[in-house]
């Protein structure tokens, strides 16, 4: 299940950049399609993350923090695309998104069911 969860968020990140670039180039139809597919992946990320949480969590703060950071990451992804669609500035959101994404990934790798890279 860990591999499925990682695959869904990697695909979601790719779809985020594709949707963002399509909104930037003015291709509204293509951007809308990829944005809707990305929303499907949000649901898959949440479902696989919840399944991992229920199956492996020993109910401590690190797991709850990881879950909260993951939901914040998804929220920032959606906010980035909506603001880009409305042609508003996204600079601050990008900074926040990168910081929260890094924290989420690092915490996920640190947890016992993550890959022990460090």
Curated annotation (Swiss-Prot):
The cellular location(s) given in this protein's UniProt record come to: Cell membrane
Q: Name one GO cellular component term.
A: plasma membrane
List UniProt keywords, sorted A-Z: Cell membrane, Membrane, Transmembrane, Transmembrane helix
Q: Which InterPro entries match?
A: UPF0344
Entry keyword GTP-binding: no
Question: Pfam family example for this protein?
Answer: DUF1516
Membrane topology qualifier = Multi-pass membrane protein
Record field: transmembrane: 4-24, 33-53, 62-82, 93-113
Task: Name the family.
Answer: Belongs to the UPF0344 family.
Protein name, entry field = UPF0344 protein YisL
Q: Which gene encodes it?
A: yisL
